[in-house]
Structures are given as C-alpha cells and as structure tokens.
Regions:
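Regulatory sensory and allosteric helical modules in signal-transduction proteins
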Residues: 59-62, 78-88
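Alpha-helix boundary recognition
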Residues: 8-9, 31, 61, 80-81, ...
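Short, Lys/Arg-enriched, disordered terminal segments
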Residues: 1-2, 135-137
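The conserved cystathionine-beta-synthase
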Residues: 16-35, 41, 86-104, 110-113, ...
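Short beta->alpha transition motifs characteristic of CBS
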Residues: 35, 39, 46-64, 103, ...
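Bateman (tandem CBS) regulatory domains
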Residues: 1-14, 71-84
Length: 137
C-alpha cells in the first residue's frame, strides 16, 4: 500500500478547532470530542498546529488563574504549545507517514496549499499492519 488516502480520515469526519476559538471553546470542544489532542485550523482551512490537553492545563493555570471567565477572553493561539503534530503533504511517501506516526498519535495531512484535508491516525496504520501480518483464518 503506497497511498496515504487509504488511511485518511477526511476533514469532514475530524474534530478540529479554529485558531480564533477561546480557551473555553477549545476545552468544551475537546471534552465533547473526547480527544487529548486536536488540530487547529484557520478559517481558510489551513493547518496551524495541534492543541493538547497539557497545553490547555498550563494555559488555564498560567494565563487564566484557573478562572473559566478569563478562559472566555483568551484565544487558543495565545497558548504556548509544547509540540505541534507535524503534517505531511498528500503526496508524501508511506515511509514519511509511518516515521511521523511513530512520534505522533495522528498525522495531519495537507494539500499543496497548506489546507488541512484530514488526518491519519497511528491506530489506522497499526490496524492495517496487523491485518497484513496476521491474516485472518
């Protein structure tokens, strides 16, 4: 298999945050989605980074003094992020995809213009490998 599209969860099926969301909006969206990390996009659909629960925790402590009212006034792009998930282009090799997935729970996939088109989860890659290595009887 040499096609990233095989593993892709399309943008329409992904949870994501817009870069103009407040900290409170991000917390609520992440709670509903049930994810510990979520992509950040701008309103043009371009990938801007990844927000993780730990980033939110430190932002609430250091920027908002643990006050949800203050979290309504601060934007998520003000939050120092420890590490963004590095995207791959849709034309990337499977080797590049697997290398990124070894260090990230998901790999954002972008087109040639930097627009987010979806993501590939580490789980999808592992499940594919498991199916190929341990063929069902």
């Amino acid at each position: 298999m040499n096609n990233i599209l095989f593993f892709l969860t399309p943008k329409a099926m992904c949870a994501f945050l817009y870069d103009d969301y407040t900290i409170r909006q991000a917390i609520e969206k992440m709670e509903v989605a049930g994810y510990a990390a979520i992509p950040i996009l701008n309103r043009r659909g371009e990938y801007r980074g990844t927000l993780k629960e730990g980033d939110l925790l430190w932002a609430m402590r250091n920027m908002c003094n643990m006050d949800m009212r203050q979290a309504e006034c601060r934007r998520i792009m003000e939050i120092p992020r420890r590490k963004d998930n590095i995207p791959v282009r849709i034309t990337a090799s499977m080797q590049d995809l697997i290398q990124r997935a070894s260090n990230q729970n998901f790999v954002p996939v972008i087109d040639d213009y930097g627009a987010f088109i979806g993501l590939v989860t580490r789980k999808a890659i592992i499940n594919y490998c498991q199916d190929k290595l341990f063929l069902q009887d």
